[in-house]
Amino acid sequence: MKNKIIAILIFTFLFNVLAFAQNADDITGLWYSQADSKNRISVVEIYKENNKYYAYSFAYKNSNDIVNDVNNPKKELRNLPLKGLVYLYDLEFSNGEWKNGKIYNPDDGKTYNAKVTLSDNGREIKIRASVDGAGIFGKNIIWQKLPSSEVPKYKSLNKSELRKLN
């Protein structure tokens, strides 16, 4: 009887681990960002390149604004548009989360450490943007996966149209 209970517990544990295991590429695709300081919601694509994950915005859900990177610390880049700017970068997948990345905040022109976790249902990601590597001093940013019915409204950019932060 004791062996049966142990076998059932092991099976239950393994089932739960496998059922909720995340694939590294689960975050790729189109997302709605959290609203910015002007209440614009970006359409963002997360993609994989050389085993790291990156994100750029290319449209707004609720606006046709063309927005420049006016707070970039490099003055010569302030007239460039945010469209196509890779502002979440170098994320590495390990132990069910994406970490060791950076995220640029165009509202203040600063770059922060970034760690990403995916919700159990795969419809939401939480980005922890922090000034310290441990994520203690920072804030959470929530992005929502685009519903499949809305994906055809948007056309991602070609990789040749993207630009790195600096």
Positions of predicted regions on the chain:
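A mature extracytoplasmic/lumenal domain signature
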Residues: K48-N50, S57-A59, N105, L118-D120, ...
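Bacterial N-terminal signal peptides
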Residues: A7-N16
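Positively charged n-region of N-terminal signal peptides that target proteins for export
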Residues: M1-I5
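Short beta-strand segments that buttress and anchor functional surface loops
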Residues: W31-A35, N100-P106, I127-S130
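Central antiparallel beta-sheet cores of small beta-barrel/beta-sandwich binding domains
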Residues: R40-N113
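Short aromatic-glycine motifs in intrinsically disordered, low-complexity regions
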Residues: K75, K126-A134
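Edge beta-strand at a domain terminus
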Residues: D132-N166
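N-terminal helix-cap/turn-to-beta initiation motif at the start of protein domains
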Residues: F20-L30
